[in-house]
From Swiss-Prot:
Top enzyme category: isomerase
One term of GO molecular function: ribose-5-phosphate isomerase activity
InterPro entries linked to this entry: NagB/RpiA_transferase-like (IPR037171), Ribose5P_isomerase_typA_subgr (IPR020672), Ribose5P_isomerase_type_A (IPR004788)
Annotated keywords: Isomerase
Organism for this UniProt entry: Picosynechococcus sp. (strain ATCC 27264 / PCC 7002 / PR-6) (Agmenellum quadruplicatum)
Function: Catalyzes the reversible conversion of ribose-5-phosphate to ribulose 5-phosphate.
Any GO BP annotation: D-ribose metabolic process
Active site per database record: 108
The reaction(s) this protein catalyses: aldehydo-D-ribose 5-phosphate = D-ribulose 5-phosphate
Protein name: Ribose-5-phosphate isomerase A
Amino acid sequence: MDAVTVMKQEVGKVAAALVQSNSVVGLGTGSTTAYAIQYIGERLAAGELENIVGIPTSFQAEVLAKQYKIPLSSLDAVDHIDVAIDGADEVDPQKNLIKGGGAAHTREKVVDALANKFVVVVDSGKLVDRLGSTFLLPVEVIPMAITPVMRQLEALGGKPELRMGVKKAGPVVTDEGNLVVDLKFAGIDDPATLEQKINNIPGVLENGLFVGVADVILVGEIIDGQPRVREIQ
């Protein structure tokens, strides 16, 4: 097993250890979060946890949770979320995030913002000085508005591109039935303002900027060939 995979597993274990019995847990999307879901399921099976309920942020998270026999519910049936565990594509020094590489950022933002504690799990390669430095900013758009929205996104200084499917002809379609526009910036100096400007465009459902939402960042690192987990509060 390669070092990066081991590192992601270690981060997943640390995140899963934060879950307590009798709690509602937001289950995020992505390769590192998948290990957290696995270890939550293993803690349940071993009797270390009991009476927890998961709120999945995507179809992928739902399938994984069912695989590991984590009981699931929906936001209609719960009045709070104790902790949410989710990944990120970029993290800046202020703990602001870009998410949405898996095209699930709208549902993720709803669940993560509702959580009393939002724990982000990443590898050290996701840490950046400025958001938008390496990763495109995803924007979920209703299909009929795609052309005017792309024009307005370009007017904000970004280079928009409709995300196309892999191993599928045509564009990526989100779990909500919408399209994703990936927006390239040279760097984002004011993520809070940009988040609001994009969301104010008619036809935009949500974008992948998560500003002031994360409580704890768990960073997986390889030091002297060994995986380590560092916590950023």
